[in-house]
Amino acid sequence: MQRIIGTEVEYGISSPSDPTANPILTSTQAVLAYAAAAGIQRAKRTRWDYEVESPLRDARGFDLSRSSGPPPIVDADEVGAANMILTNGARLYVDHAHPEYSAPECTDPMDAVIWDKAGERVMEAAARHVASVPGAAKLQLYKNNVDGKGASYGSHENYLMSRQTPFSAVIAGLTPFMVSRQVVTGSGRVGIGPSGDEPGFQLSQRADYIEVEVGLETTLKRGIINTRDEPHADADKYRRLHVIIGDANLAETSTYLKLGTTSLVLDLIEEGVDLSDLALARPVHAVHVISRDPSLRATVALADGRELTALALQRIYLDRVAKLVDSRDPDPRASHVIETWANVLDLLERDPMECAEILDWPAKLRLLEGFRQRENLTWQAPRLHLVDLQYSDVRLDKGLYNRLVARGSMKRLVTEQQVLDAVENPPTDTRAYFRGECLRRFGADIAAASWDSVIFDLGGDSLVRIPTLEPLRGSKAHVGALLDSVDSAVELVEQLTN
């Protein structure tokens, strides 16, 4: 089981002492405070390389950027001020008025959990550093997807796929899976509808914002399947599946299964396994129906007339994935995902609350029901919306999820030391290692970087771009000895270009 995967999370942000504060400003303060605490001067801060970005290229074969007029002029100084690349290979920046942490590329879902969790520690530290700045208002950051006022912000997943797989097969095979997986991956939400005005509890924070089956947009008319075709790799060989339907998860089992099961279902699709019998009659409607039924008993209509629950759909995918994995050479990583997936589905079938120590939405629902019973509250009570928000607070001593972990009421898959190491260090088995180590060792000599290149400024007449189009190259095994053998960026570039 080896697929390049990673997460990118826009964090909710607020300034309790100044509710009217501009979120772009406060998000910028968070990023800059983290950079300052890391001792990175603005003049030496590595910028993001936008030259290779193509967010309007569509996997269905067209490019909206060609018909939208000349590209906007980006002020590198203005953007770069709140845009940094970390020594762990991640990107920390301001996106749509939110601080965003884009994790480095991983090959294993458990590693992806570690570097995703590292983002929570980065954001917690950023808010703490802002509070230490004289005159700056305190900030609170939340790993969630809704602001309670009708807006949603993203927690996206990325999966590298073979370009040879027709995108139509991706849409057909993945749609029923994405619709049904929220029984495992939902983070839970108080309120129904985009603004949360209707009282109740639902599985997913993202479900009410899904409007179409397939689409390019990520901020409006959001699709179950996103069609952005921006591989950040060799475009002749790869496509990057950009998933926007998912929730921001804190529970490590939720994150692990979100990434691991999706990766294995993509194996099915790439192998050409026929999944057409799982087509849904009304996929967008099914997203909403499943999210709004915490009992997990609601059924959705398939195109062939059958009615199945989300758990039943997940079991069909599980069985087909297990059959594929059994036909291959032994793969302990894939087997562990399958075992965990099967166990979670069994628990959910028996009683969803049996997953309250491992999945987000049951954990949150258990907390909320406790408040409701103790204080005789209805789902309309504002207090419950506050509990919902506090669950996602990234502060280790205040966030309700983190407090559950501290008292042993939430099970972890990884150790805190692994997470803290990942805050500083990149994964060793992808190009993120080369990017992160270059930043650590030669940061002052790097002008810019992106997922697929590192650009050096060695004082000559021109910059030197080192492409990293193969995500599995640039690993420690590939370049570790080279990096250890050179004393300067000049030597490194000479070795690489010669």
UniProtKB/Swiss-Prot annotation:
Its EC number(s): 3.4.-.-, 3.5.1.119
Positions with a binding annotation for Mg(2+) 2: E8, H156, H242
Superkingdom assignment: Bacteria
GO MF entries: ATP binding; hydrolase activity, acting on carbon-nitrogen (but not peptide) bonds, in linear amides; metal ion binding; peptidase activity
Residues given in the record as Mg(2+) 1 binding sites: E8, Y93, E100
Keywords: ATP-binding, Hydrolase, Magnesium, Metal-binding, Nucleotide-binding
Cofactor notes: ATP is required for the deamidation reaction but is not hydrolyzed during this reaction.
Pathway(s): Protein degradation; proteasomal Pup-dependent pathway
Cofactor annotation: ATP
Residues binding ATP: G6, T7, E8, V9, E10, S102, A103, N158, R240
Phenotype on disruption: Pupylation is severely impaired and the steady-state levels of the two known proteasomal substrates FabD and PanB are drastically increased.
Biological processes, Gene Ontology terms: modification-dependent protein catabolic process; proteasomal protein catabolic process; protein pupylation
Catalytic activity: [prokaryotic ubiquitin-like protein]-C-terminal-L-glutamine + H2O = [prokaryotic ubiquitin-like protein]-C-terminal-L-glutamate + NH4(+)
Active-site residues, record numbering mapped to chain: D95
Family note: Belongs to the Pup ligase/Pup deamidase family. Pup deamidase subfamily.
Functional note: Specifically catalyzes the deamidation of the C-terminal glutamine of the prokaryotic ubiquitin-like protein Pup to glutamate, thereby rendering Pup competent for conjugation. Probably also displays depupylase (DPUP) activity, removing conjugated Pup from target proteins; thus may be involved in the recycling of Pup and may function similarly to deubiquitinases (DUBs) in eukaryotes to prevent or promote proteasomal degradation of certain proteins.
Further remarks about this protein from its record: Is the only enzyme acting as a deamidase of Pup during pupylation.
Xref: NCBIfam families: depupylase_Dop
Protein name as annotated: Pup deamidase/depupylase
Organism: Mycolicibacterium smegmatis (strain ATCC 700084 / mc(2)155) (Mycobacterium smegmatis)
Gene: dop
